[in-house]
Amino acid sequence: RCLSMNAVRSNSVDFFLGTTTPAGFKGYFEPLRREPGMQMYLIKSGPGCGKSTLMKRLAVKAEQKGEPIQRIHCASDPDSLDGVIFLDKRAAIVDATAPHVMEPDAPGAEEQVVSLYHTLDADALHAHADEVKRLFAQNTALRSRAARYIASAGSLLLDSRRAEACSANFEKVRRYVKRLCARTLPRLPEGASASEELRLLSAITPKGPVFYRGTVQALADRYVVFHDDYGAVSRLLLELIRAEALARGYHIITCPCAMHPDDKIDHLFIPALRLAFLTDNRWHPVQLPGVQAVRCTRFVDRENLAGYRARLRFNERAAAELLEQAADLMAQAKACHDELETYYRAAVDFGKVDEAAAQCAGMLGLA
């Protein structure tokens, strides 16, 4: 069961920038830093010290001015923000603490640290040092257990992908992509420079898999949806479409698969054409009106694939149970984190946090 977040605001979209994968935490904060001309503001402070609230305020201010933004949600708690990207300003403010620690490469030049540590009363925290340390350790242990379940699910899903790959006609996929791109991606004027943003459209969270369908509706009016239960065909389709879009000079938003981010793309946006190529499966059902649906079984020898039926069914059932268990452990870790926040919140001077928020608004031209 996948939660889809539906709020459609064309000037404000939602993504993740990191998630727990079978290989551990995978973040795209560094590629964001390397996007051309991106000015980074790196927030440092403890849990419950107002980082997310500060960023939410800045996001609202930008929205009120009609500025396009991307809200970056935290996969451990999707109601909380890990960052806000201000597209017109080429600026981003992000939570630069674990598990996505960032330090400035060029302090002051392209990055500024926004420290909120001065808002903490260390003496008040020190009185609860043992309890705070215990909760940090417990949170880490629960997240590690969740990661192991995600890793197990990942290996089963990879096994299914390999089974489908044994039955797929990849030459047919290549010919199809050539025709599709000729039809949907008009050639741009000579010298158009291609660029790419990496974002996650879905993630495994304490609420289960979350998919930001509202972002799709905000960024595109035309949808080509590849229905692929196992991922081998859609993986090649998206890889080839990405290469073709970049070769033709388009700016694209590439959304890696949250389970196998290093070798599989799930979705791709071409904002200039308001066009999206999407993968639809049980983990993130697309369910949008007026889509051009492509069933990936057309590229597969179904008779051959039928020989794997029992194995594929087992993998799907077992992976679903493992991911359910992972979400449950993540929910326990979040409850632990919430308890940790109560200690920090009691030790924070929120007047000073408000001052820092006003300073940030000034730096970003949102005052």
PLM segments and residue spans:
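N-terminal pre-Walker A segment at the start of P-loop NTPase domains
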Residues: M5-L32, E171, R175, R179-V216
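Conserved nucleotide-sensing/catalytic segment adjacent to the nucleotide-binding pocket
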Residues: A7-G24, V60-A124, E131, A245-E324
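N-terminal low-complexity, Ser/Thr/acidic repeat segments characteristic of secreted
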Residues: N11, Q39, E190-A194, R222, ...
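Glycine-rich phosphate-binding P-loop
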Residues: M40-A59, P209-A245
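A cross-family "folded-core" feature that marks the main globular domain of proteins
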Residues: I43-K44, L54-M55, A62, Q70-H73, ...
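An accessory alpha-helical subdomain
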Residues: E131-R183, F314, A318-M363
